[in-house]
Amino acid sequence: MCLDEVSVKQYGDIVIGKYGGNISAGAKKNEDGALVWSNGDWEFAVILDGHNSAESVDLVVNTIQKEYENIKAIMKESIKTVFRSVENYILTIFQSPSFKEKCERVKGETACLICVRKENYIWWLSIGDCLIYVFHEELHKLGQYTLNQRQFYEWIGNVNTFDLPIPCYSSGIRELRTGKNRIVMVTDGVLECGERRYETPLNLYNDMNGNNVELKEHVHNVLEHVHHQFGRDSATIISWDYENDAYATYPSDQPEKIKVKK
């Protein structure tokens, strides 16, 4: 559960950091979840933040895990179709009668953020209040950090957005910039503690970059900060780097930067 303890592990290029909360602040349980797959050509990551028990987290993780072979097959599609296909597939799972029946039987509900990187693009599907960032020097200069916006009244589980007449979620696709892109996914425990330093994306950008420090150490330092700020909620981080050698889009009045891929 990692109560009063920071645990950071690396799986290939992907770092997962977990912190169960500060016991002296009243932490008793860890209801976060994480799932990552990678094969070198793509990454598939899920981060979850359960409410009122971890049963909904377990349900979502187990449901997606059972679809590994099907999702792996979808990831072989061309870049032009892969994101639409994976989104449609996941939404079909979440909207299936069998999954919705299981949701009715669990205690509590969960926020769920899914991310896929393939080639020089990144796609996400967000239900709830987890956040995903892309940190890059060019984006930093323009104050651009987050891909999604936190939604505080969306969940999967006993209270289920997919039970609504119109399910509510957000999704999107972004082109990654040329060079190093640092992808960071967090649960709200990283943001909502003490002085709430990381509710300001610039602070998280600064603490996840620089000083020739390994990514694993950056993640550890951020979670140590949460501990010292008496974070009561569990906090989870998934992060990895993607070095993009493809040309990125620039405006037409910067011809010196515009390159045409042949």
Positions of the model-derived regions?
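PP2C/PPM-type serine/threonine phosphatase catalytic domain
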Residues: 1-262
